Structures are given as structure tokens and as C-alpha cells.
Amino acid sequence: MNTILGSDTVKRGMAQMQKGGVIMDVVNAEQARIAEAAGAVAVMALERVPSDIRAAGGVARMANPKIVKEVMNAVSIPVMAKARIGHITEARVLEAMGVDYIDESEVLTPADDEFHLLKCEFTVPFVCGCRDLGEALRRIGEGASMLRTKGEPGTGNIVEAVRHIRKVNAQIRKVVAMNHDELMTEAKNLSAPFELLLQIKALGKLPVVNFAAGGVATPADAALMMELGADGVFVGSGIFKSEHPEKFAKAIVQATTHYQDYDLIARLSEELGEPMKGIEISRLQQHERMQERGW
């Protein structure tokens, strides 16, 4: 089989086009159309949003292709879909279906507890989660074209996403301040490719976009993550588990775009009704913490 590989430049360029926007989880065509009308730059097609996956337990797998196709046929914006960590065949199936992006996602039950996908061998671009700079650079080294914080999906609690974006950015500042002769040791400490540390040193930032994800539940949450340096926002359960999904979707898009307009965010938040019910992170058992999946 002859495989045509997409270049890093093209793949990363597609992600750059989403910068500053909101990507919303949807489970059917109706939700996808709501997301598109609200101004989402892309949608993530799943069978269940993260809060439902968390509640159901068991093994969470790639969405039924019928659902993914339904969403793809319903909207004109890019459609993403999730594959299990290390599940080569799920990723190949999604690629064959023509999705615009694949999320190698810790929200689903990992298929491989030792190896992530070698994403550079695919034509379709990938997004992956990270909690720190080491994880970020390992995923980029495998071929990820876009990153997102892991946060703690399905909780409606922003604290872990805040922790992750702050840690990545602090570690980037540390690398930028280093002398070149210190970078190899830092690469060893981070278990990350040396060449990527050189890129960060030169660019002053990651070579790919890094979105916020995992716990965004309100317009203020979305604005906070942008304030902390995120390039955009993924919203999983926060929209369609709220009292008024259409209003929430539009408000989160506006808050992401105008994240320093605090008067606007206040007005947007007035008539939204109840957000999704949240979970205190400390109440989660170790095996319930999705962010611990992958390495």
C-alpha cells in the first residue's frame, strides 16, 4: 500500500487556522448544527460526551462511524473524531472516512498502555493532550500537529486545565532562558527530543498551537484559559450538559474571542441558566482520573 504522508507544515497550518476559536463536542447532527451556528471553528464527533463516558464507566471506544458521518454531512466546518491511545486501526478507519483531525484521546479507554500512535505516518493531522512540556514535546515528536491541555474531562472543573497550561508555559519560559549548552540536559530531564527544545528556544513558544481542554464549563472558564495563554478552547460536556446549550455555545465563543472584555463576559453570563453540574477533583479515585492515561 502506498501511503501519502501530509507534511508537518500543512498539518500544523490547518491547526493554526483554528487559533482563537472554540471546538465543541457533539454527538449528533443537531448538536453539530447548533455548534456551527454559534460560531465554533470545528466540532468533535463522539458517541457520548466526556461526562457521560465518566458516568457510564466500562470501556470507551471510537464513535460509531455512522455518527461521525452524520456529523460530517451536517456541517461545513472541520470535523474531528477521537481514537483510543495507541489504537492504530481506529485511527486508520477515521482517516479513511475523511475526518479533518483525529484526537488521540485519554477520554477513551487506552488500547495500548506503552505506545502512543506514530502520528507522522498518517496523512490526517492529530491533536493530543498534555499536562507538561515533556508530554507536549513527546507528542509533537510522534507527529502531533496540535496540542490541548488534558485537564480533567467531564468534570466541569477548570482547575486541572489551569494547572496544565501554567506548567507548560512556565517550562517554556525556563527553556527560553537557558543557554544552549544546558538544553541537552533539559531534554534528558523532560524525556523529550533535543531538536524540539532548540525550536522552542528559537521561537519562544511551542511549534504547534496549544488549546485549553478538560473542565471548561462557563464563558468565564473559556476566557480564563485564553488569559493564561491558550490558543483556543475545546468544550466537551460544558455546552450540551448546560440548561440552555444554544445560549451557552454562543456565549463561550464570544467570551473566547473577547476574553479581556469583562463587561461583555458579565452580560453574556446573565441569562444562561444553570451550567453543567461539576465534580470536585479531590473526590475522584486515581483510576477515575482520565488525565493519568498516556505518558
From Swiss-Prot:
Record-annotated residues binding D-glyceraldehyde 3-phosphate?
A: 166
- Any one Pfam family here would be SOR_SNZ
Molecular function (GO) terms for this protein are: pyridoxal 5'-phosphate synthase (glutamine hydrolysing) activity
What does the entry list as the binding residues for D-ribose 5-phosphate?
25, 154, 215, 236-237
Please name the pathway: Cofactor biosynthesis; pyridoxal 5'-phosphate biosynthesis
Catalysed reaction per UniProt? aldehydo-D-ribose 5-phosphate + D-glyceraldehyde 3-phosphate + L-glutamine = pyridoxal 5'-phosphate + L-glutamate + phosphate + 3 H2O + H(+)
Report the EC number(s), separated by commas if there are several: 4.3.3.6
According to its UniProt entry, one GO biological process term is: pyridoxal phosphate biosynthetic process
Q: Which InterPro entries match?
A: Aldolase_TIM (IPR013785), PdxS/SNZ (IPR001852), PdxS/SNZ_N (IPR033755), RibuloseP-bd_barrel (IPR011060)
Task: Give a yes or no for keyword Lyase in this entry.
Answer: yes
Matching entries from NCBIfam families are given as: PRK04180.1, pyridoxal 5'-phosphate synthase lyase subunit PdxS
Q: How does it assemble?
A: In the presence of PdxT, forms a dodecamer of heterodimers.
Q: What does it do?
A: Catalyzes the formation of pyridoxal 5'-phosphate from ribose 5-phosphate (RBP), glyceraldehyde 3-phosphate (G3P) and ammonia. The ammonia is provided by the PdxT subunit. Can also use ribulose 5-phosphate and dihydroxyacetone phosphate as substrates, resulting from enzyme-catalyzed isomerization of RBP and G3P, respectively.
| Similarity comment | Belongs to the PdxS/SNZ family.
For this entry, the protein name equals Pyridoxal 5'-phosphate synthase subunit PdxS
Lineage from the top down?
Bacteria, Pseudomonadati, Pseudomonadota, Gammaproteobacteria, Pasteurellales
